[in-house]
Amino acid sequence: MILYIVLPFYVRTKPYSILPSYSSLQWITNAWCSLPSIYILCHCSKHQEEITILALKPLIAMNNSEEWPLKHVQPPKLSFRHLLSRSVTDAPSLRVRWFYAVDRPLRKSRTGPTEIKKAKNFLPFSAEDSEHIEKSYLKAVENDGQSEPVNVNEDYLYSVNVVSRELSPIYWDGPVYRILRGTWFFSRGDKLYPCEENLATQVEEGYLNSCPYREFSNEKDSAAAQSKTWALLGRYTGGFVQYTGSRNARLVYDDFYRNVSVKIMNRFSPASFHRSDKLVRGYELDMLESNSKPSTPVPTEELTSTTLLNDSSDPSDNFTPSNTESTIDLPSATDASHLMSRPDREVNHLILCCHGIGQKMGERVETVSFVKDISNFRKTLKKTFNSSPDLQAVYPKLKGGGNGVQCLPLLWRQDIRFGMARDLDSSFADDDDDDDESLNMSRDLALDDLEDDSIPTLDNINIPTVTGLRNIISDVLLDVLLYCQPNYRDKILAAVVKRLNRLYNLYKKNVPSFNGHVSLLGHSLGALILFDIIRYQGNIKYSKLQLDFPVANFFALGSPLGLFQMLNGKKIAGPIPKTNLTRSLSYSEQSFDSGVSILSCQNFYNIFHPTDPISYRVEPLVVKQMARLKPQKISHFRPHQDLSSSGVGHKIAGGALNVLSGLRSGIANTLILKSLSYASVFNEATADSHDESQGAENIRDWHIDERMYRLNKTGRIDFMLQEGALDTSYSYVSAMNAHSEYWKNVDLAHFILTQLL
């Protein structure tokens, strides 16, 4: 038996949610809940057609706050608005724009609890991303809520789920943000305010039913505009919409007239008794071109988006149109062209960045975030390249399309639980196709065992006093101490290797065209971890620590690895050359096995700030005589605007191709001539020496150069950032922040770009 309920065409409803004004139907659905199907047919006398709006099994009248009562029946996800728009064939096309929140995340992680506070600041996706998201949305409607994730934003580092309305990072476990489908917008001056989706759905339904575009194609019939009204229901009861043009409307609302007829209200009520807002249908390109302000988020009091495909709203949001202040400033003409078309930039160098100590504290302190640090570093690289005339002159193909470098953070500390007697489900376990690829570190590293003779955990020996201070010590200092223990060190290395391989393979999967170099960058303890991983490459004894890619460059920032190597009594060397001449001057095979760490990478850079108390030199561990030389200073970077103001920029731009064409091959010679003071001594000795002992000394000096060149094409490894005026005067104050201030340093960014490109 099938129950048919015939309602007027102007009834608007959503799956399993009858609007309050039609709550009288609840007794029908309750009485016939056992029926196999209930159809609601809406008859439109104007178009002389019947449209099947919903076909549910069964349809239950209920409020948004109630749950789906029949557990054995899956709630429908079909969008009513989508079906209604199909029935009207002559309606103007709707230019949809998708937005994403930037201030308050839905969750702090993929598996974390949902936050109660709603987002206030939204930004529009690029036109290309918005188009892809809309296609995925329409496909999800057709497939009953089944959709594929859409990769969006610069370099496609984030993924959108249109069904759950969520934006989440792809390559790391980070905050999940809300997205919003913009169809109708509040128009106030030169700004557009996207309507909340439930409100926009009702306004669009009234637009399709009233068809104002048919009578107002010439924008002349103002009298008819007053009759084109549409009452709002649900949380917006008491308000109504007046359609004043082919894509314009006014939203009018006042609680005093909540129970008064819309027609009476239009004819007799003073305009001062109620408020109104201008509405615009669609995110039109002409509005973008007419605006000159950049696209920046502006705070709002209340703005929420749906989290279901059926455009249901959260009744706890207490949303009213008058409280909508989530302004989306329209971009300038130049920004608008970027939004409409965003070419995919070519990436030639992928940098995987490993954090050091203190990241465990990020679970308690939001300001401690390695993801944010790498985001700042990525922006600094981009800004530096765009303001560097020498780099743009040497690499003109990269100008305007990015710097050819991509940086991805590697978070390993959350995988390691020292002394925690509980299972840890990896947040990335669902991202992999098989169990071998998952990073499920379910077993505890403290060997927690219920037997009496087992090793106690950290929780067992901890004293429950001064908890805050002990947490800081546990989250920061304990990382270094435990890494010195072989048991924990092996676990950390295994976890980092799995993360590195996962990041690389996932990036190759999302960017199949990538065929560039892969470099590793480690900060603090992270540099020490990567150093150990690189020196194990090619060694069959450490098969579980092998990487899926060769390492081109290794950057160590603020690293203590020089201290650790010295304490272990080990020297550092580059790959063993294959020529007979070089082999005769190299270490013996026995020395490589016992006291030398061999790095399997093309270039090794040890970069530090002079006041960083954590960093140490490594060149004396390669050649002891290098201790006589000061670290190579990294020159200050002068942005393009500074050079242009003095007229030097035009000279560089004009002769850059001639002067800098050999930048990559000549930078090594430049650095060596400036830094290696013993080079002149070697030349003098070669010219003046005639005896055998002096010749042996010459070969020994050449041997020093050869060993340095094995580890770096420039012949140097230790590179030091220059101090500022305040750093020199207040060195102890500067030391407090020097260890964490690498990510926004333009001198460092410019130096790394010159070495990579």
Swiss-Prot record:
PROSITE patterns reported in the protein's UniProt record: DDHD, LIPASE_SER
Domain DDHD: 547-757
Cited function: Probable phospholipase that hydrolyzes phosphatidic acid.
Xref: SMART domains: DDHD
Family annotation (Pfam families): DDHD, DUF7131, WWE_2
GO CC terms in record: cytoplasm; mitochondrion
Biological source species: Schizosaccharomyces pombe (strain 972 / ATCC 24843)
Region Disordered, residue ranges: 289-330
Protein name per Swiss-Prot or TrEMBL: Probable phospholipase C20G8.02, mitochondrial
Keyword field: Hydrolase, Lipid degradation, Lipid metabolism, Mitochondrion, Transit peptide
PANTHER family named among the record's database cross-references: LD21067P (PTHR23509:SF10), PA-PL1 PHOSPHOLIPASE FAMILY (PTHR23509)
